[in-house]
Design a protein with these regions (language model features):
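Expand to "…catalyze enediolate/carbanion chemistry for C-C bond making/breaking, isomerization
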Residues: 1-162
Length: 162
């Protein structure tokens, strides 16, 4: 639950797309990327109800491939797969970050979040300063946030480390 998400949605900066058929996943995603107006939308969420066509491992390979290909173009990819849901025990801060009633989606789907890398880096720096990540398990923080921040710094801030 990103604290910036509600503002992006309210400001119309969030684009949500759903894979409409079972044709090749990469074809849909690449088409979205080519069509992305970065001045209009800060983030794209690509939902895929046909996620059963690929395993969790294959999905992670897609994320890694797109990051390797697009990070240098100031684009970062994150994904969520129904076969690896956030659990209360491991990631309570993600499952119920505000203690609100959790909405249970009857139609499972994978989700690829595509965002401007610089914007994500800067937002993450702000969140770090206000203590947002303090409740995160250290291993999860390292895997998700610290690694991403180091990648950005390596690509765009030569000689700077977090």
């Amino acid at each position: 639950a990103c604290p910036f998400a509600a503002k992006w949605r309210k400001d119309g900066k969030l684009r949500i797309e759903v894979r409409s058929d079972k044709s090749k996943y990469e074809k849909h995603l690449t088409s979205l990327l080519k069509d992305w107006n970065k001045k209009k939308h800060d983030i794209i969420i690509f939902c895929d109800p046909y996620y059963d066509q690929y395993s969790l491992e294959q999905f992670q390979e897609k994320i890694d491939f797109y990051n390797k290909t697009y990070n240098r173009r100031d684009v970062y990819f994150m994904g969520f797969h129904p076969d690896n849901p956030a659990s209360v025990e491991e990631q309570e801060f993600l499952v119920e970050p505000t203690d609100d009633t959790t909405y249970d989606n009857p139609i499972p789907y994978s989700m690829m979040l595509i965002q401007k890398f610089k914007q994500l880096y800067e937002a993450s720096c702000k969140l770090h300063k206000i203590g947002y990540y303090k409740k995160w398990p250290p291993e999860y923080y390292e895997e998700v946030v610290a690694t991403r921040q180091k990648t950005y710094e390596k690509l765009f801030k030569k000689g700077v480390t977090s």
